Amino acid sequence: MKIEYKKYTHISFDLWLTLIKSNPEFKKKRNLLFKNFFEIDSTMDKVSEVVRYYDVLGNNINEKTGLNIDTYELYYLILSALQVDIAKIDTDKLSQFYEETAALFMEYKPELIFPDTKKLFQEMTNEDKSINILSNTAFIKGRTLRKLLAHYELTDYFKFQIYSDEVGFSKPNNEIFQLVFDEINTFKSAQKKEILHVGDNSVADYNGAIRFGFDAHLLKI
């Protein structure tokens, strides 16, 4: 990962498609689990199609509103679209499914996109740069993503991690970038132009950061 970061005091990183990418087996296994867990009559192809549709739609809505659609809301939308009577499914059932999904996620872990990520973070922190994670979420909650970063031994490099499901805002909303700025200023005095946000999404990451007043690096993989 090539980033010109020397002139900044703090670097903020997106997570998905910036630092990690999905394990191709995970979504297949998750969709099969969804079908079996909720005893859905539809074909696997149909289940996969509907899950994908609401995954993309949820991300698009979050970017448009700047808010965060809850994972369980997405589950209910998918179940309803697959002709399941959601009146018969309480949130405890959804919670059980999420825990099984999280276990599957850690079994079929996302991969680090850049093998030298840990080395880069070490270099940054050695130069007294501080770093954080700022990520929108959908099907996988922030608490599970924290476990993934711990698995890759990256947690200690981050001063903090902010996930949309935990704060109720999504990029490119100014509010979530404000949370980053406020958190940075709890441990150092920093101006907006001293902060670089790195991400792959031109709307959520690049435009959002620039509009707020940070500098931004659009990562192209």
Q: Predicted regions: what is each one?
A:
Residues 3-115, 127:
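N-terminal helical cap/lid subdomain that shapes the substrate entry/recognition surface
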